Amino acid sequence: ETLTITILNRKGLEAAHFFCGCDMFRSLQKFSGEIINADGQSVRKIKKSELQKSEYSSSLSTDDYFYFYECNYPSLPFTVKYEWEVKCNNGLIGYPPFIPLADFNQGVEKATYRIELPAGQGCRYRELNTQGKGIQVKESTGANGQQVIKATASKLSPIIKEPFGPDFTELFPRVYFAPSAFKYDKSEGDMSNW
């Protein structure tokens, strides 16, 4: 995955932080980051060894943990770019969702999501809150018969949080993806429909 975000003022600093949740089924394999100043010059490279790991959980027993990096570059505006790879172990019941707007008061210039599956493996998806928001999902077939799904969003205006207003789930556009046939831990099944 790749995330590039430009921070324009102090209110947006939290959006520059990196977070990746892991557990016995998901692990962070690769990571790199880069901070770019207002002049477009790379001022800092971030390595996986600089990530902090936390195993804090409100549950009594869990194997969940997460990696995070707090990006606190002092000069605004700046851009931060993260690239990472997550490995799924013991099967998969869902792919990461496409959520181009991550928080209130953030706009999106361009967001893309692409999933490519080998021939014979199906993927289903469900769009929520995408009507009239400039989000498109297109399916195609690759040269070797693979299923390709691409979701795009461009020029999304920020959603302003209103006191006592609707929740994130009612406002923000997103697309969920899941394999039609799955294997998870020691279970197998078919979820061809929702």
Which role fits each region the language model picked out?
Residues K87-P97, L101-W194:
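Secretory-pathway-linked proteins and extracytosolic
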Residues E1-R114, K150, A181-D185, N193:
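Lumenal/extracellular ectodomains and adaptor appendage modules
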